[in-house]
Amino acid sequence: MKQPIILHIETSTHVCSVALSEGNTCLFTQINSEGMNHASLLSVFIAQAMEILKQNNKKLDAVAVSSGPGSYTGLRIGVSTAKGLCYGLDIPMISVSTLEIMTKQVLNSANYDSETLFCPMIDARRMEVYAAIYNANIEVLREISADIIEENSYLEYVKKNQIVFFGNGAEKCKNTIIHPNAVFIEDVHPLAENMISFGQKAFMDKNFVDVAYFEPFYLKEFQTTTPKK
């Protein structure tokens, strides 16, 4: 059975990355973390990926793009680029949650107990973050929401399980969420290479988004809530 060739685009934070995959195999990836110069970087990275396909006489089957939450500007650039490719090549588009991409990266970096929970965080403003909670199978235990962090945030989870906090929103929470079960990991940013398994599954399941109407989860659209205790 032919394995799908998918281009993955991740632009939800200051890190811009692209990956090219065939099935679950990464054929190419490029990363730049120098700042929000995503538009020009994407054009270069994508041209490099397409040249690899041309040299191997292969064609793209789909484009996967991070869906947020994240930077309004970054997401807009990534999604508009993905839409342009899908329209031009007449191929489907796949969306992947930014928080799931980050969780996949953390799970790939170390061995965790099956009971460990994972809380990726995207920085918003002041003590606000955009977060979700997943188990070790990246199954959603708590949906994405905007949270104002205080000392009892996520208490119902952290008092029962070890919970790993990470992402650019986790740094400001370290001195507020203090518990023996709370673990903080630094320097975790969503990367396109960690989208591959999600893109592959979505393609096989034909779980595509409408290219014309798809919009990512911009931070400004979230409703602020206080996490349940």
Where are the regions a protein language model picked out?
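N-terminal beta-alpha supersecondary unit
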Residues: 1-67
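Stable alpha-helical structural segments in soluble proteins, enriched in small hydrophobic residues
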Residues: 49-53, 88, 106, 192-203
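Glycine-rich phosphate-binding/hydrolytic loop that grips phosphoryl groups
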Residues: 185-217
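Short amphipathic alpha-helical face segments that pack within enzyme cores
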Residues: 41-44, 80, 84, 101, ...
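Surface "functional belts" at beta-alpha junctions
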Residues: 2, 25, 37, 92-190, ...
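Residues at secondary-structure transition points
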Residues: 33-44, 72, 76, 80, ...
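DPxDG-like acidic metal-binding loop motif
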Residues: 64-98
